[in-house]
């Protein structure tokens, strides 16, 4: 029975959320030697955005960005998922919160991977095109959003007005490094009941064979 319960635990653990979109390479690789600024008004006041597409509806659990901090303050980045408005970011759909601290960009890895969590109904997205928008509200903080694996190209947008909703300049440039993860599926109560009942039956049969 212990073996069967172990199988149940393993099967649940394996039901992790899917990768919905990524510009990272094998082993979450990215270009840590180049990137675009995400900074406050005492620098360039740059807001940087990358487009992504969902082939079907999904719930976002988090986004992972490759970010590094330039010398100065190290205020958290605010990350948004925005609608697509004719090839540039549109209205804010969801707000994601930074988890942890951004490492120095000059550490030999361009900083590192930083997780931004999404929670609530806002994270349920329909199929379609969206934008991931990184905004730094602290005037004295400058972050660098590293480039994607092998500097692959895609739709990227910028503005130097410090506004997460534009106006935008957009083009087909080297993308930034990021990944969007889906939420883990939650089994229906009925499915869990059937599974557990099946395990109990299998365990009873095994016990009978061992005692025979």
Describe each region flagged by the PLM.
Residues 13-37:
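Boundary/junction segments of secreted and surface-exposed precursor proteins
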Residues 209-212:
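Short, charged juxtamembrane terminal tails flanking transmembrane helices
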Residues 17-20, 40, 50, 71, ...:
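PGST-rich, cysteine-poor low-complexity/disordered linker and tail segments that act as flexible spacers
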Residues 2-11:
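Bacterial N-terminal signal peptides
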Residues 187-206:
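A short, hydrophobic C-terminal helix/tail in secreted or cell-surface proteins
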Residues 55-62:
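Extended extracellular/luminal ectodomain segments enriched in beta-structured repeat modules
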Residues 42-54:
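Short beta-strands within extracellular/lumenal beta-sheet-rich domains
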Residues 69-160:
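Aromatic- and Gly/Pro-enriched, solvent-exposed loop/edge beta-strand patches characteristic
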